[in-house]
Amino acid sequence: MLWIQPACLLSLIFSAHIAAVSIKHLLNGSDHDTDVGEQKDIFEINLAAGLNLFQGDILLPRTRNAMRDPSSRWKLPIPYILADNLELNAKGAILHAFEMFRLKSCVDFKPYEGESSYIIFQKLSGCWSMIGDQQVGQNISIGEGCDFKATIEHEILHALGFFHEQSRTDRDDYVNIWWDQIITDYEHNFNTYDDNTITDLNTPYDYESLMHYGPFSFNKNESIPTITTKIPEFNTIIGQLPDFSAIDLIRLNRMYNCTATHTLLDHCDFEKTNVCGMIQGTRDDADWAHGDSSQPEQVDHTLVGQCKGAGYFMFFNTSLGARGEAALLESRILYPKRKQQCLQFFYKMTGSPADRFEVWVRRDDNAGKVRQLAKIQTFQGDSDHNWKIAHVTLNEEKKFRYVFLGTKGDPGNSSGGIYLDDITLTETPCPAGVWTIRNISQILENTVKGDKLVSPRFYNSEGYGVGVTLYPNGRITSNSGFLGLTFHLYSGDNDAILEWPVENRQAIMTILDQEADTRNRMSLTLMFTTSKNQTSSAINGSVIWDRPSKVGVYDKDCDCFRSLDWGWGQAISHQLLKRRNFLKGDSLIIFVDFKDLTHLNRTEVPASARSTMPRGLLLQGQESPALGESSRKAMLEESLPSSLGQRHPSRQKRSVENTGPMEDHNWPQYFRDPCDPNPCQNEGTCVNVKGMASCRCVSGHAFFYAGERCQAMHVHGSLLGLLIGCIAGLIFLTFVTFSTTNGKLRQ
């Protein structure tokens, strides 16, 4: 089939819901939910712990710098150990942070297997790390209050070689430092360093960087900032830590000289004419069209019609032709490394309710051809003509294509069709629940502190009923201009056979940044882990996570019981919501998951005796003269300072030499993927075949690669024959010409 102009796609969700808004108002004395407080700044945590580290959270070696010294850059993947003294929630948050690195960058991690260089994550005092690979075992401390995904990403970036953003030599062009407002003896944290010490990797100053100080870092007066931005609009942006910025990722990939991610299989926003290599079906009745946002009723999801000459999507017109006519749109051939994928996309159906939108896969037939079709999910038309998000779980282990099939249900009663935009295929699980809240701007404007919206019930993979509560203007905090988010359990169909109280489950709530490219999303993720210690006097000291029909309250909206809530009354600022793409299309999207972490209770493995903590650590702003003009007295530590150890002096301080045994090391299977790192040479694709790495080699028109690791280059036989023929012909022609010339000379 020929391309015309396109719009396309559809989806499946484990559990999805678009909110019919019902706002509940807080009555005096009726609020018994638990607020865990706001996320504390890293430096606030470290100050409370009595730590005075270099730049607030760095143990700095005297002699090397990973931004300039290639030997301090890690060999990927990076080995790690999760110490048993870590909180269970911290372990889950660390693994979640690893997945963000795998999804958005070329950096990867692997469980420790005796390597000389590795990272051990421990619960020591405060949140801190070292800069770069120290060529020995080294700590990252995830202490009390540090177990947030973004905080962990921040400390890992230090370990990968990054300093704070405002340490750049050109920072005074972009921010103001109010020296008189800085706590005495902490001024060193605001020093800048020249290009001989750190490098910006040829990138611009980044207010949104995960590595930027907040406006109130190390301040004397809690209401007066120590750092403000030259562009006032960024004063409320710096220091907010939702996720990596786009420039953070550019620097990370430049530092490690690689660009490919590990778990992103495909992405398409249809902004380019080649529509990401997708192809039309050849045996169907019609084609998908590559549409744009030139018409008011045809607005894309990527740019929501805000850019003239841009904003494309795929579209299948269901208002013309005959009932039952269909059009296929297929992806390029994809090679998975893991056994599970999540296909996420945005779609809308504006035609007849009888229209159908289906997701299929075309699989390897075991003879090398991708041809066997299997239906995965069907979507039916409805009266909601807004863009919707969809998630479809795939379980492909061999090469495959995903396929979108649109079918006309009743052209005579259709005035539109099926739209598709912003496709993302990752090798990660789909969320258990997806809650879309429409008209969010009106909700933010018309609600007050304490007003709340309660999500419908979702089910996780174990069968627990879960949900979230949204506080559009916060819950009970004194600060205004914030959105709150909490988690609760619902009674459900499976309660009779489930474990109660439910413990060791990590509740994960994500407010989605709807940026088209998942690598550039700065979504906010909050998580905590259930415990039998989480009780409430409102239920006579019972565990909050006991069976909801026993300790919860009846909710007529779901005809079920709902537990007390646990979460954050001040989760994210309205300014950040409006600055990014959290409110695209005037909709707020929230993901919810509930994952069992019991297998992570015992994760520690003994480290090699040869691996020791590096000597020569600088603390308290005591960097050497080579590191800054305003440096102070240096202190050389011969071992990990006692102030950084455990809070409980009666307990033996852990080091990388005292890690103890590990029992039931039940890591997810994908951590042992033989294709991580890719063993294939010459841009070959690695495929996991029954636990063994199998290389799919690149083939061109003239040359192809072969061998177990695609290490040998060959010339195609047809081209080789042609070359031999050409050479033989050239020799013959030369001989004839020479003979003819000699004959003429003799005459």
UniProtKB/Swiss-Prot annotation:
Ranges that cross the membrane: 714-741
Parts of the chain on the Cytoplasmic side: 742-747
One of the Pfam families matching this protein, by short name: MATH_2
Signal peptide: 1-20
Top enzyme class: hydrolase
The UniProt record lists the keyword 4Fe-4S: no
Residues of the site described as Not glycosylated: N601
Keywords of the record: Disulfide bond, EGF-like domain, Glycoprotein, Hydrolase, Membrane, Metal-binding, Metalloprotease, Protease, Signal, Transmembrane, Transmembrane helix, Zinc, Zymogen
Domain Peptidase M12A, chain residue ranges per copy: 65-259
Top-rank taxon, per record: Eukaryota
Catalytic activity: Hydrolysis of protein and peptide substrates preferentially on carboxyl side of hydrophobic residues
E.C. number: 3.4.24.18
Domain EGF-like: 671-711
Glycan-linked positions: N28, N139, N221, N257, N317, N413, N439, N533, N540
Disulphide bridges, residue numbers: C106-C258, C127-C146, C268-C430, C675-C686, C680-C695, C697-C710
Residue stretch(es) of the prosequence: 21-64
Cofactor(s), by name: Zn(2+)
Post-translational modification (record): N-glycosylated; contains GlcNAc, galactose, mannose and a small amount of fucose.
Region feature (Disordered): 638-663
Quaternary organization: Homotetramer consisting of disulfide-linked alpha subunits, homooligomer consisting of disulfide-linked alpha subunit homodimers, or heterotetramer of two alpha and two beta subunits formed by non-covalent association of two disulfide-linked heterodimers. Genetic factors determine which oligomer(s) will be formed (strain-specific). Interacts with MBL2 through its carbohydrate moiety. This interaction may inhibit its catalytic activity.
Record's protein name: Meprin A subunit alpha
Organism: Mus musculus
